[in-house]
Amino acid sequence: MCGICGTLHFDPAYQVQESEVRRMAHPIIHRGPDDEGFYLNNNIGLGFRRLSIIDLHSGHQPLTNEDGTIWIIFNGEIYNFKELRKDLEAKGHRFKTHTDTETIVHLYEEYGTDCVKKLRGMFGFAIWDDRHKKLFCARDRFGIKPFFYYLDGSRFLFGSEIKNILQADDVSREIDIHVMDYYLTYGYTPIDETIYKKIKKLEPAHTLEIKAGGEPVIKRYWDINFEPDDSISEDEWCELIENKLKESIEMRMVSDVPLGAFLSGGIDSSSVVALMSQFSEQPIKTFSIGFKEAAFNELPYARDVAAMYKTDHHEKIVEPESIELLPKLVSAYDEPFADSSAIPTYYVSKFAREYVTVVLSGDGGDELFAGYDHYPMAHKIQKYNMLPDAISKNVFGALHRAIPAKVKGKGITYYLSRPKDSVSAYISKFHQTEREKLYKPNFWNAIKNNPSESYKEEILRAGSSKDLIFQMQELDMRTWLVDDILTKVDRVSMQNSLEARVPILDHEFAELSFKIPTKYKLKGKSTKYILKKAMRKYLPDSILFHKKQGFGVPLKLWFKSDLNDYMNDRLMSKNSPLYEFLEPTYVKKIIHDHQTGMRDFNFKIWTLLFLDEWLNQQPKS
């Protein structure tokens, strides 16, 4: 695992200096503390930071082919590289290292830009093709590894993190207010944009080619495609799931440095640990985070799995003082990011790094197997989408207004009163009607004709399936999974120089899941039914069927107690940069309603706190 960056100047006479690229690479030493390397050739410069995982002594980058015409910088892991290498050697290619990186160089020589279709792994890389004077960049299918870029009239800049690009001279830091609206709606920035108007993300499963002075050519090389196969029985699906997940996990246990696993006690991480134990003669090192608040603490479940498989188990408790981490989190993410589970993810990553360099995680199971609460909710909403909009709005709107705030079930009436955007509304931090009150008039007027909800509604309409659950899964994979879950884990794990591998998001395993009918994913009251059944020979029902807790933080309680003063000092300050955009009276109402117990607004409060800190960290003009 590594960090990459680079610059391509459009003036062919321009000479890139090592100091330029070194300055871009310096802020991501955490991604690669073991080595650095640079390639300079007139108007192209590539920078690299290495975290040594495979072939510890000969994995220096940038790495080239035999005649020095193809150069690569690579961040990630290719798990089928040995198989690919054999095929390439049979075609006459000669290798000088044992790294997966070199395999990509020869694949590019042999297959050109189609080389990415043969890769099984996680990656963000850039190849300089000196013969054709072009830069070829790619990102893995699910976006496990990041790739950012910046384009102006004179150059193309790129990096594993936004901070790489911000180190270059004269990079615009203009804030994109539409992206800020998207952040306040969903808690993260969208798949191809960033909070900075001119800095973009290369989307998952896409490649980018650019020559000096030209426009980037961006292409998709893989896609999510749900094609349910009803010819396969329930038991056959279980066997297919077990075998393919085993294969994926075994591939990801190849490492020349110590390796372990995150263990939350949920079905996904527990399944990963259970299957890892089938391939290791030594106890698996497992790492868990807990809280003193019982409702948020899954440590008892993690301990049960650790005891069952005799793992070398390690635990840590997170307390309210962890709020002191906020400035460091803002620096790690480079842009607003409102998932508070970044706090325990940071601590478990830092904790694990004391023992290992690589961990396997259970991320992706909820998206592939319909594990979130909103999947059953979507079924309920779908029943009422058959009603005319006017009836839904009038009947359920009136019901929503009549029900007191504390009454259970009030929320569902809101979503049913807005059937067309109920899916987006359900997963919003601030709904559209709330944002109209929260935003100052100039901010609201600038975005009201293109609100953030329309972005996800377009994805739903363009989905590959008419099945609502498949649509929801696809929406989650194209937004929440990449922009929240995978972003969260990548930034804070790499902040601690820890590589996190994601076996459930192996693309071949994912393609298998795309064929499983909805009836096997949601059955009765059970989400992820078919995965639970497939894992029953490895895990007890107490693990498989206990109530889903997620990786939440007890902010609801902390904001009423230990963090009450902190919250008020930050958000009620007249000097808060929030109030260039937001109405102080509405923020005050949010805090009041939370403190008095009228509503649980901990997600909204954390969203505002993170944005407040991010704005405070911006250079003053």
Language-model-detected regions and their locations in the chain:
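Active-site adenylate/phosphate-handling loop in enzymes that bind or generate adenylated species
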Residues: 347-406, 480, 485, 489-509
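Conserved structured core elements
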Residues: 235, 239, 243, 270, ...
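Short beta-alpha connecting loops at secondary-structure transitions
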Residues: 165, 288-289, 335, 379-387
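PAPS-dependent sulfotransferase catalytic domain
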Residues: 332, 346, 350-354, 430, ...
